[in-house]
Amino acid sequence: MTQAQARQARLEAWQARFGRIGALLADFGLDEASFLDGLDQVKHGCRQAWLAGVMTGFNGNLSLRLGKHLMLVTASGIAKGHMEDGDAALAKMDGSLLAGPALSSETAMHVAVYKARPEARCVLHTHPGCLLALSVKLAGRLGGMLDMPLFEAAMWRPKLAIAGAFPPGSQELADSVGKAAEKAPAVFMEGHGLCTAGTSLAEALGVTEQMEHLAEIQLRLI
């Protein structure tokens, strides 16, 4: 089977489950090739986050903008380290499902972050262990997160904002994260995890890894 045939087989398998999308994509100036490329990026991003240890089991979610009006979003309740083509859905930028499986319960948060940061092409939500452990250690003093006498910390701490503790998947959480994202590309959600935005998938993941690395250092100093 040629590469072109393999890609066509993947597309047909996805459409057999969720319906044909060629005309739908064309309505937004996209084609099936860009859709498949997006799926590959989403799967790769989740796999890399899983390998980095910032996504475990079924937690976290990722979205990738396709053109100006659409995005791919990880589906609800999937193991991010072992994603398949059918584990991502196609949605409008307002968070409404166009085709595919049920959207992540955190989709509203992604919508809010894209509104806050129009340049973003990817939004990544993870549960990094060191950041979460550090937040427990600093209970009531989250303003001190990553506050260390290091050049690296001085560079990255201003890029981290704090959002309040709201139920996962709630509109209150989405609104809080969206407001915080206006100030910084990384938002720590109290008692929950981290949300990062980037102009690419690599940037969103890189910011996540940077914040987790600094949190690990600070934990050793406490």
Where do the language-model regions lie?
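Glycine-rich flexible loops
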Residues: 1-222
